[in-house]
Amino acid sequence: MQSSPLLENLIEHLRCLPGVGPKSAQRMAYHLLQRDRSGGMNLAGALTEAMSKIGHCTHCRTFTEEESCAICNNPRRQNSGFLCVVEQPSDIPAIEQTGQFSGRYFVLMGHLSPLDGIGPKEIGLDLLQKRLQHESFYEVILATNPTVEGEATANYIAEMCFQHNIKVSRIAHGIPIGGELETVDGTTLSHSLIGRREIQL
């Protein structure tokens, strides 16, 4: 038990970060208080500003402080005819770093998981349906994670695209099965994009 309630509170809240356990949270808290109080204040300010000002792009649903993100506002992207569907906002910079894609995105904010109560509406597939109806796409690239849930989600979206006569492809499985897209190295992800395959019924 810590002697300071404020210190206990800080450690407890640092544990909300992914991969941070009690010991790591304790080290962070002591480091900020002992060696970098100004850094801690800057971190607190940045967190407060980000939490209050960053929302979702009205088109692709990634994070942005504007109504539309920079990618969706890019005329070259708007006229590309390509839409890449990903599970998380963090997947976009991973794909962008490959330099192999210059189209637009749609972020699901998850994947289908009926056992957890996550259906099509919970991951924004009603919004994706509207985009497929009202925007012109030559090809939809499905870049969901190569997990059971990711594959099920990709198949569901493929059916939606077939209804609109839109070509559908799935990124190649150079990515390890069960892996997360944002943790894959750039070379592997680049080859996966180049070697994507069309889905056919």
UniProtKB/Swiss-Prot annotation:
- Listed GO MF terms: DNA binding; zinc ion binding
> What is one GO biological process annotated to this record?
DNA repair
Kindly give the SMART domains that the UniProt entry links to this protein: TOPRIM
Similarity section: Belongs to the RecR family.
Which chain segments does UniProt annotate as zinc-finger regions (C4-type)? 57-72
* Entry coiled-coil feature ranges: none
A Pfam family found in this protein is Toprim_4
Q: Which organism is it from?
A: Histophilus somni (strain 129Pt)
Task: Report keywords, A-Z.
Answer: DNA damage, DNA recombination, DNA repair, Metal-binding, Zinc, Zinc-finger
Gene3D superfamilies for the chain? 3.40.1360.10, 6.10.250.240, RecR Domain 1
InterPro entries (alphabetical): DNA_Rcmb_RecR, Rcmb_RecR, Rcmb_RecR_Znf, TOPRIM_dom, TOPRIM_RecR
- Tell me which residues make up the Toprim domain: 81-176
Q: What is the name listed in the Swiss-Prot or TrEMBL entry for this protein?
A: Recombination protein RecR
Sum up the protein's function in the record's words: May play a role in DNA repair. It seems to be involved in an RecBC-independent recombinational process of DNA repair. It may act with RecF and RecO.
Q: Does the keyword Metal-binding apply?
A: yes
